[in-house]
């Protein structure tokens, strides 16, 4: 498939339509972030069970989401943090009230649409028995994701108003609307309200009328000038709606409008990030290639040394024809990865263990499983106590907890046999995508299904499908990405036409295993139930393809915001499309839940995913392929990748889910913010990767150009806006205080308050700029002291030539530069907990190896010139590597 063509500016930016012929040029689409009165929204309960009768015990709602650690959260930073706009103080400090100004303070925003005019009656927050979004204005508040960042936020001038200034008082609480379709609905409702006011036509009481609010203003009470202004604003708002509706015809769905907008916003954010530093460029490329649905060009791997030798071997003589090719015994249609296992012979309904698996640590396992219904269950301990059978144990206990074995007449021995067979088809030698990850996603899905806002919403069959999908969603995962399989022309990629390769394979294996002996757990379902369950499972597992992330996010956010601007405020979920949309996003949230778990668990998952990435990078290096982003163990920045992953992927998703089930997911967001802050604080302490030119070594393919994103004309203009100046540069600090003040100067610049995503940009910029400034200052000062001319790095083709030239012109300069900069530049995080056995720890093994390599290179460069004592260099595990920075 050919890569998609670059969309035009009009198709990318729905809110930038050009004027029609013969029409006066309209103002740019209104420059504000949409704010609507907070509307009570609830999800319609649809019946909990497929059976007609339910026991009274089952009618009780599930317990709300609880934290497994059950710790006191009164002192947690996330709960004390007030809700900050994204970005916050970085973009101005203007004050004001977005709701008090009426039409006089009208602003315009190129992304979003017109401000609701003063004639519109706000909706009052009313109590609702179901799901209420932002019901209380005085609740704990936090930062918002980049989705709420407007085009005007890129303006660094002091005139730019902070979005904090537009938050209204408690009496006029508002929600922010960012999806295009919800904005059009809100705008049309505003036009309708203004029309009624201007014409004195009474508004009939129907679903389009506000549920509550102040008494409508009478036209007689308005001055002529006010009426004229209101009429002009109403006409302008209607014109904007027409422009948006004219562009809708090119889209398959209204949610795709939001998807295109979000992708464009993310591309713009990643473009800024990629320009900051090498590590920022790598993080940007990783996020773009993993979470944006793009068709990348297939890379043909260069032949290895053995293949070259085969090509150079003498061809057989004509008298000796080559042997005929061996035919493939395995047809393309055959599902690969299946094993012949025998678990059914030793199992029957009478000898099933208490927790579904045999263990000699039953009491310890029972203690851990007390947290089965809580967020943050320590799945690592469960696996240890269950003899490595965490997936079977968790699935068995959840089915018992929800009484699904009885409801669907699933034989217990069949259930356990299938789960043991399924778990055996997860690869134990894969660091992350193994049965432990599947068990974690399964338990997380179970907890999300039990959230009070979703009580009595989904049927038992839908719950069964969601749990089954979570259990099989990564079965037979080989530990490499879809793109790796495509680039290597694997059989799986050929079979599934490069589309969601692994996800299709997981489904095929999961359903194929049902055909094994005594493994069909759905044998007593009706034909219609089986067909319905299979369709739902396929939809949910395919949604775990991370390249579909932005589409899933846009679908969910459009659904939530559309209900925010409607007066009914009821999410009916009365059709398959809406119901499966919520279930798809639920499993997707569970699949991306690692950063929302307690920090000690999150760090273990990070160690595992990075180990898997590095293993893939090693395989790509062996094949002579370009190493995928974040897969090069010599250059990957673990902490920065996690901050970017949270800012651009995890936070927007969980923020939207929290809106859907408010307030049930608030503590999850608090944990996510705390974990993000921890990894952000670790950036300045972890060793920076060595120069990429040196780390790759000879014989490796050249580095690709800086990762670039397609920008529209509007976005290119924004790129010209200069970044805010850092208060104190490294050179000023060196001049004023000498080398002893360098570290304080760095602390001062990093301590500069900024928003989450902007913080990651600034740290990466500081890393590159400070390193360059310090190197220049060192060389200049030492060259002046020896009377030689300073050496310019760009006069040489490589860093090695530059170092040699400096050593000849000023040995003392190199003596200072080589050992000091790597040691001073960054310090690693203290290891409060050891890394996993056999896996690199984020700040211990991986970072110590980097520092050790940097020290060896510095030593080898110095040894032949001035005999520097190598004992002065920082050693791995010391103050400059994996040790405590204090």
Curated annotation (Swiss-Prot):
Q: Per UniProt, where does Zn(2+) 2 bind?
A: 474
Pfam families for this protein: PDE4_UCR, PDEase_I
Q: Name one GO cellular component term.
A: ruffle membrane
Binding, Zn(2+) 1? 437, 473-474, 591
Keyword terms of this UniProt record:
cAMP, Cell membrane, Cell projection, Cytoplasm, Hydrolase, Isopeptide bond, Manganese, Membrane, Metal-binding, Phosphoprotein, Ubl conjugation, Zinc
Q: Where is the composition biased (Basic and acidic residues)?
A: 51-78
Residue positions annotated to bind Mg(2+) are 474
Report the residues modified as Phosphoserine.
13, 152, 157, 165, 209, 346, 686, 688
Name it: 3',5'-cyclic-AMP phosphodiesterase 4A
Q: Which organism is it from?
A: Homo sapiens
The record lists the lineage as:
Eukaryota, Metazoa, Chordata, Craniata, Vertebrata
Task: State which gene encodes it.
Answer: PDE4A
């Amino acid at each position: 498939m050919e890569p998609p063509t670059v969309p035009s500016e009009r198709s990318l930016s729905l809110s930038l339509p050009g004027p029609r012929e013969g029409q006066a040029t309209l103002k740019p689409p209104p420059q504000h972030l949409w704010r609507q009165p907070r509307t009570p929204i609830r999800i319609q309960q649809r019946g909990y069970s497929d059976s007609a009768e339910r026991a009274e015990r089952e009618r009780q709602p599930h317990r709300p989401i609880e934290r497994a650690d059950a710790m006191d959260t009164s002192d947690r930073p996330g709960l004390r943090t007030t809700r900050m706009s994204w970005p916050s103080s970085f973009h101005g400090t203007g004050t004001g009230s977005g709701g008090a100004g009426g039409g006089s303070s009208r602003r315009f925003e190129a992304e979003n649409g017109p401000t609701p005019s003063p004639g519109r009656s706000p909706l009052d927050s009313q109590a609702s028995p179901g799901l209420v979004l932002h019901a209380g204005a005085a609740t704990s508040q936090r930062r918002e994701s980049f989705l709420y960042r407007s085009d005007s936020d890129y303006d660094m001038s002091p005139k730019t108003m902070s979005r904090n200034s537009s938050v209204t008082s408690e009496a006029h609480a508002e929600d922010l609307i960012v999806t295009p379709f919800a904005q059009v609905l809100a705008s049309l409702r505003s036009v309708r309200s203004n029309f009624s006011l201007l014409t004195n036509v009474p508004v009939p009481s129907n679903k389009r009328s506000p549920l509550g609010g102040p008494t409508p203003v009478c036209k007689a009470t308005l001055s002529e000038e006010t009426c004229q202004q209101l009429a002009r604003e109403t006409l302008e708002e209607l014109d904007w709606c027409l422009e948006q509706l004219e562009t809708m015809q090119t889209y398959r769905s209204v949610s795709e409008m939001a998807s295109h907008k979000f992708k464009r916003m993310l591309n713009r954010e990643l473009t800024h990030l990629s320009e900051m530093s090498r590590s920022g460029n790598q993080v940007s490329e990783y996020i773009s290639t993993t979470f944006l649905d793009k068709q990348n060009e297939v890379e043909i791997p260069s032949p290895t040394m053995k293949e070259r030798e085969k090509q150079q071997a003498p061809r057989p003589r004509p008298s000796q024809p080559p042997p005929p090719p061996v035919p493939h015994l395995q047809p393309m249609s055959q599902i690969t990865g299946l094993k012949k296992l025998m678990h059914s012979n030793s199992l029957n309904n009478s000898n099933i263990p208490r927790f579904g698996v045999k263990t000699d640590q039953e009491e310890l396992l029972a203690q851990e499983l007390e947290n089965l219904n809580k967020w943050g269950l320590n799945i690592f301990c469960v696996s240890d106590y269950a003899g490595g059978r965490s997936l079977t144990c968790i699935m068995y206990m959840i089915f018992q907890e929800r009484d699904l074995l009885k409801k669907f007449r699933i034989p217990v021995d069949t259930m356990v046999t299938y789960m043991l067979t399924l778990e055996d088809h997860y690869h134990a030698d894969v660091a992350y995508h193994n049965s432990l990850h599947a068990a974690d996603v399964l338990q997380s899905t179970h907890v999300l299904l039990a959230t009070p806002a979703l009580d009595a919403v989904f049927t038992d069959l839908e719950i069964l499908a969601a749990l089954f999908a979570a259990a099989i969603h990564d079965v037979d995962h080989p530990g490499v990405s879809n793109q790796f399989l495509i680039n290597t022309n694997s059989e799986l990629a050929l079979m599934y036409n490069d589309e969601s390769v692994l996800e299709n394979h997981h489904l095929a294996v999961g359903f194929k295993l049902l055909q094994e002996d005594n493994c069909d757990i759905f044998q007593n379902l009706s034909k219609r139930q089986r067909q319905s369950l299979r369709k739902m499972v396929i939809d949910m597992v395919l949604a775990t393809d991370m390249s579909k992330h932005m589409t899933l996010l846009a679908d969910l956010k459009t659904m939530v915001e559309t209900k925010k601007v409607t007066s009914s405020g009821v999410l009916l979920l009365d059709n398959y499309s809406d119901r499966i949309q919520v279930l798809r996003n639920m499993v997707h949230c569970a699949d991306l839940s690692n950063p929302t778990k307690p920090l000690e668990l999150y760090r273990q998952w990070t160690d595992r995913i990075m180990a898997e990435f590095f293993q893939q990078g090693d395989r790509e290096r062996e094949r002579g392929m370009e190493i995928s982003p974040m897969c090069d163990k010599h250059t990957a920045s673990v902490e920065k990748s996690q901050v970017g992953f949270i800012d651009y992927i995890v936070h927007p998703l969980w923020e939207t889910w929290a809106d859907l089930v408010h307030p049930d997911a608030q503590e999850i967001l608090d944990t996510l913010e705390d974990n993000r802050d921890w990894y952000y604080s670790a950036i300045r302490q972890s060793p920076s990767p060595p120069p990429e030119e040196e780390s790759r070594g000879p014989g490796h393919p050249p580095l690709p150009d800086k990762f670039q994103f397609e920008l529209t004309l509007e976005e290119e203009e924004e790129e010209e806006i200069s970044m805010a100046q850092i208060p104190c540069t490294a050179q000023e600090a060196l001049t004023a205080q000498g080398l002893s003040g360098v570290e304080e100067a760095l602390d001062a610049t990093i301590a500069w308050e900024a928003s989450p995503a902007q913080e990651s940009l600034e740290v990466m910029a500081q890393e590159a700029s400070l390193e360059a400034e310090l190197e220049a200052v060192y060389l200049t000062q030492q060259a002046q002291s020896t009377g030689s001319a300073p050496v310019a790095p760009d006069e040489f083709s490589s860093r090695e030539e530059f170092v040699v030239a400096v050593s000849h012109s000023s040995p003392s300069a190199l003596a200072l530069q080589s050992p000091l900069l790597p040691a001073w530049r960054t310090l690693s995080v203290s290891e409060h907990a050891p890394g996993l056995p056999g896996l690199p720890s984020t700040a211990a093994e991986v970072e110590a190896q980097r520092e050790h390599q940097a020290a060896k290179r510095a030593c080898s460069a110095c040894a032949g010139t001035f005999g520097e004592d190598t004992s002065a260099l920082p050693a791995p595990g010391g103050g400059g590597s994996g040790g405590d920075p204090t």
